């Protein structure tokens, strides 16, 4: 496997690991429903400490599944629609396409 494909698979591994947690899926769902949301509101919604919530938000940020905007002392998070919508994209499907089943990438 060449380095490019290896890097691509690592990128998807990080995203799927981030999604492999119910709390993070719940966070993403709330952001999808609410749009840009202050971390202070998220702590109330999920009834967790800010440090525990920050742990999950960092994993989602590192996987590029959410975005963060800082205004003053508060951080606002939103779903990265483009990244989430492309997660099960043609690109990923092509990686696992059997040889001889046509070109797609």
Curated annotation (Swiss-Prot):
SMART domains found in the cross-reference section: HTH_ARSR
Q: Which UniProt keywords apply?
A: Arsenical resistance, DNA-binding, Repressor, Transcription, Transcription regulation
CDD domains xrefs: HTH_ARSR (cd00090)
Task: Name the source's superkingdom.
Answer: Bacteria
| Any Gene Ontology biological process | response to arsenic-containing substance
Q: Which residues form a coiled coil?
A: none
Any one Pfam family here would be HTH_5
At which residues is the DNA-binding region annotated? 39-62
* Domain HTH arsR-type span(s) in chain numbering: 4-99
Any GO MF annotation of the entry: DNA-binding transcription factor activity
Q: What does this protein do?
A: Transcriptional repressor for the ars operon.
What name has this protein been given in UniProt? Arsenical resistance operon repressor
